[in-house]
């Protein structure tokens, strides 16, 4: 896809990230409780969302995005671990086979109105994907980079790249 990727620490401030002149932000996976990481990550993510940059989060990045947008997270009774987890794409109506490794989830109850649920687990109906209704900001709970099925989730990267190309045309930097 010919993307230039710059990796920064999760504690890098928004100003330093914006000085890199990104066309998009990828919120990666990682271990642990999203609320603990959120103490320093949420203010950074809020500033990046205000810049109207495309943002794509996976796993912990998905949970942090949810927290940033006003959702709550909780520890699951039974985490999702392994391959072959069926997830329904609520926009397209199809089922994707995913790989997962998480023990926390975004809570459905009292979800802010600016969040659209895009994906749902067929095992327990937990939220597997969200998007911000007004901006090119979205995330999934699972690992689309692992390609457990016949590239079931490659479209997520294509959507993100399309958003970054559109953003690059704005020549904001």
Model-derived regions, located:
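Cysteine-nucleophile active-site neighborhood
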Residues: 19, 29-108, 150-165
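N-terminal Rossmann-like NAD(P) cofactor-binding module of classical short-chain dehydrogenase/reductase
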Residues: 26
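Flexible loop residues that form catalytic
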Residues: 30, 135, 145
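RNA-binding accessory domains that recognize and position tRNA/RNA substrates
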Residues: 1-22, 32, 147-149, 155-173
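Structured helix-beta-strand junction loops
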Residues: 1, 20, 51-52, 113, ...
């Amino acid at each position: 896809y010919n993307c230039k990727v710059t990796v920064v620490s999760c504690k890098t401030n928004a100003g330093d990230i914006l000085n890199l002149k990104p066309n998009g932000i990828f919120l990666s996976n990682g271990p642990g409780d999203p609320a603990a990481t959120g103490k320093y990550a949420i203010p950074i993510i809020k500033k990046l969302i205000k810049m109207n940059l495309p943002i794509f989060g996976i796993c912990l990045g998905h949970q942090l995005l949810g927290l940033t947008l006003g959702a709550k997270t909780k520890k699951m009774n039974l985490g999702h671990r392994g391959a072959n987890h069926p997830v329904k794409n609520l926009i397209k109506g199809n089922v994707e086979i995913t790989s997962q490794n998480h023990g926390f989830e975004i809570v459905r109850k009292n979800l802010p109105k600016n969040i659209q649920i895009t994906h749902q687990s067929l095992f327990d109906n937990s939220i597997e994907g969200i998007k911000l209704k007004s901006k090119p900001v979205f995330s999934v709970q699972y690992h689309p980079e692992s390609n457990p099925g016949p590239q079931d989730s490659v479209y997520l990267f294509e959507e993100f790249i399309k958003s970054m190309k559109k953003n690059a045309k704005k020549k904001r930097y």
